[in-house]
């Protein structure tokens, strides 16, 4: 392994450590979303606002939440 390869590997590893896990971010938004879905059903229009807030929060951390449709 060359010195350049070692540097690149260290940078990649550091990036992975700096990025939080999806389960550890947006907890309040996730709780609101999950509670709404639990009591109103996944297809309820009532939950759309909470789902969108959660998706926007996750995007802020670099995660992409796929649409259920």
Swiss-Prot record:
Coiled coil: none annotated. The keyword Mitochondrion applies. Pfam families: COX17. Disulfide bonds join 26-57, 36-47. One of its GO terms (biological process) is copper ion transport. A motif (Cx9C motif 1) lies at residues 26-36. Cu cation binds at residues 23-24. InterPro entries: Cys_alpha_HP_mot_SF (IPR009069), Cyt_c_oxidase_Cu-chaperone (IPR007745). A motif (Cx9C motif 2) lies at residues 47-57. One of its GO terms (cellular component) is mitochondrial intermembrane space. GO terms for molecular function: copper chaperone activity; cuprous ion binding. PROSITE patterns: CHCH. Gene3D superfamilies: CytochromE C oxidase copper chaperone. Keywords: Chaperone, Copper, Disulfide bond, Metal-binding, Mitochondrion. It is found in: Mitochondrion intermembrane space. Belongs to the COX17 family. Copper chaperone for cytochrome c oxidase (COX). Binds two copper ions and deliver them to the Cu(A) site of COX. This is Cytochrome c oxidase copper chaperone. It comes from Saccharomyces cerevisiae (strain ATCC 204508 / S288c) (Baker's yeast).
